[in-house]
Amino acid sequence: MKRVTILAILLTALVACQNSTPTPLAPITTATETEFTLGPGQSAAIVDAVFTIRLIGVTNDERCPAEIECVVSGPVTFTITLQKAPGEPVEYTLQSFTDHDGRSPDGPFEGIQDRIEYEGYVIRVKGVLPYPLKSMDEVKDWEYRVSFIVTKK
């Protein structure tokens, strides 16, 4: 009976560890013309542009896994909010193609919104990591990191 109880406790602890959510990422401060990276729920105050960008999360990842041959590789889609104090946050959905290193191309693609204009600035996606290796659903939501750059329009 004692062994069964110990086994049950260990099994419960193992399941709890696997289902735990990571600690939220701390907000960062950055400036225009500087690439920065956010995780889901994390925000960056763009000091010289006087607004905040928050990555809500990746909503869809259709990139072809690196170890699989695909006919087509799709974009990764994610949601951000932009907020200029004291206003309300405005939500945007962006998409980007990436190479296997997770870097986004510099040029725009027709039908893909990888940049937006906001308050006289351009917010552009620079990369999305990690890149899936074996399956499209192997990356956990909290593992994603999206890199941006903010430039004056």
State each model region's role.
Residues K2-A8:
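Sec-dependent signal peptide recognition
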Residues A13-A16:
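C-terminal motif of bacterial Sec signal peptides marking the signal peptidase cleavage site
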Residues Q18-S20:
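Bacterial signal peptide processing site
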Residues P22-T32:
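Short, low-complexity, disordered segments immediately C-terminal to signal peptides
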Residues F36-V71:
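Post-signal-peptide N-terminal segment of Sec-exported extracytoplasmic proteins
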Residues E62-P65, E69-F109, D114:
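Mature extracytoplasmic domains of secretory-pathway proteins
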Residues G107-L133:
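Acidic, glycine-rich flexible loop segments
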Residues V128-W142, S147-I149:
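Short, exposed beta-strand-loop hairpins at the edges of beta-sheets
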